[in-house]
Amino acid sequence: MSFEVFEKLEVKVQQAIDTITLLQMEIEELKEKNNTLSQEVQEAAGGREALVRENEQLKQEQHVWQDRLRALLGKMEEV
């Protein structure tokens, strides 16, 4: 009877070890995925910053052209 108890205990311990091993592998996979996603977020943030700067530059250029157009229209009205 004692031997059967030890066999059952051994099976349960082995199952626990297998479960722990699988969970450790899953944790490693999730860590890798997290690192990949973190890099993607950083790249996206950098891309966003570049787009914001480009947008500001384009707005400034638009204002310059609008001012030039207004000046040209003003000269045309004088004629």
From Swiss-Prot:
GO terms for biological process: division septum assembly; FtsZ-dependent cytokinesis. Keywords: Cell cycle, Cell division, Coiled coil, Cytoplasm, Septation. Pfam families: ZapB (PF06005). Gene3D superfamilies: 1.20.5.340. It is found in: Cytoplasm. The keyword Coiled coil applies. One of its GO terms (cellular component) is cytoplasm. The keyword Metal-binding does not apply. Residues 6-78 form a coiled coil. Non-essential, abundant cell division factor that is required for proper Z-ring formation. It is recruited early to the divisome by direct interaction with FtsZ, stimulating Z-ring assembly and thereby promoting cell division earlier in the cell cycle. Its recruitment to the Z-ring requires functional FtsA or ZipA. Homodimer. The ends of the coiled-coil dimer bind to each other, forming polymers. Interacts with FtsZ. Belongs to the ZapB family. This is Cell division protein ZapB. It comes from Yersinia enterocolitica serotype O:8 / biotype 1B (strain NCTC 13174 / 8081).
